[in-house]
Amino acid sequence: MQDWVIIDTETTGLSAPIYAVEIAGQRMRGLEPIGQPFHAFLNHQVDIPPAAQRVHGYSRNFLNLNGSAPLVAHREFMGYVGNALISAYNLPYDYDKVLVPEWRRLGIEPPLPRGFCMLRLTKKLFGSSPANDFKLQTLREHFRLPERDAHSALGDVQTVVDLLRVVLLPQLQKTGLSKPGP
């Protein structure tokens, strides 16, 4: 069974250029997390807009004290991912809009292949939202999943693992499928 990695990022915002200020990942084998998660703060030496700070709480001062050089953090992340598929709750954002442009700025070749989008899978399985919307934290509250550190990359990765194992797997089994991973 091929390993895959659930990833998440926290960023400087939604408008380009977008810089990752935190990256997290959890290696999976089937539906089981294996090993320790990956986690890194990145210090790009750029200002963090107040709106982004309100979401994740990371200031430029915090990143100056706790962040790694982006090239170092991304190389460590690539080492963690290896040849596994990369999946995320919102893959088009985390992978296509955040990581790929950042890797190109740093001269890193984006890994292939990318995996699947958990948000898209969730929408396909449920059709309409079982909660008010498909936001990760809304679903976490609706399905009474453990409270994690919301709007931190590591907390969101852990919430996606919970959502996958507790909510999506039973839905997949109802459709006759049992393995959403590669």
List the model feature ranges, each with a label:
Residues 156:
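Conserved catalytic/binding loops enriched for acidic/polar residues
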Residues 2, 142, 161-182:
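Acidic two-metal-ion nuclease catalytic site recognized across multiple nuclease folds
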Residues 115-132:
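Short alpha-helix plus adjacent loop in nuclease-associated cores
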Residues 1-113, 133-147, 151:
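Conserved non-catalytic scaffold segment of RNase H-like nuclease domains
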Residues 9-12, 118, 159:
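Ser/Thr-centric signal marking residues that sit
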